[in-house]
Regions:
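Beta-strand-enriched cores of mature, soluble protein domains
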Residues: 20-178
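Sec-dependent signal peptide recognition
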Residues: 2-8
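C-terminal motif of bacterial Sec signal peptides marking the signal peptidase cleavage site
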Residues: 14-17
Length: 178
């Protein structure tokens, strides 16, 4: 009898240990609740620069890449990202960004920052979105590090310390998040 009980327990443990792990459940956001996220952002594109006297330069940058977000408050997991920005080496950066998820739903944001090699802290203000991101608001910040800056204007880089928070709109608050 003891052998039979031990055999049943061993079989139950073996079965439980071989079953797939389940992802922790996430609560659905309530309207007005702030959700925090962090992530990585890598992009490549081009930059056109003009001299503005002395060491000052003006640039237009166009970047496309991928953004992956983590954390229980992330608005989505993966996005295609696009950025256009005007950078003045003395005055900073002003730009716009669009994140597009796998469904085609988008998040729009305004980028502002120091935008210089010595001080490159950038802040994004989420202005809204489409589909499940309709009515979304929030902010995020990061520092940008260029990995490639070629003479022909080709650039490639990544965000360091990307963190933010979002408040989902009424329409998207009751929906599901990936």
């Amino acid at each position: 009898m003891k052998i039979l009980v031990a055999l049943v327990l061993a079989l139950a443990l073996a079965t439980a240990s071989c079953s797939p792990a389940t992802e922790p459940t996430r609560s659905v956001a309530t309207p007005g609740e702030w959700l925090e996220f962090e992530g990585s952002w890598n992009a490549a594109g081009n930059r056109r620069t003009i001299p503005l006297g002395g060491d000052r330069r003006g640039s237009i940058i166009n970047l496309k890449g991928t953004m992956l977000l983590a954390g229980p408050g992330r608005p989505g997991t993966g996005f295609r990202s696009e950025v256009i920005a005007l950078v003045d080496s003395a005055a900073g950066l002003l730009g716009r960004s669009v994140w597009t998820d796998e469904r085609g739903d988008q998040v729009f944001s305004e980028l502002t920052g120091e935008g210089t090699a010595a001080k490159n802290h950038i802040t994004g203000t989420i202005l809204g979105g489409t589909g499940r991101y309709a009515g979304v608001t929030g902010s995020y910040d990061f520092s940008w590090r260029f990995v490639i800056e070629a003479e022909d204007g080709s650039i490639q880089g990544s965000a360091l310390g990307l963190k933010g928070r979002v408040r989902l709109g009424q329409q998207s608050a009751g929906g599901t998040r990936p």
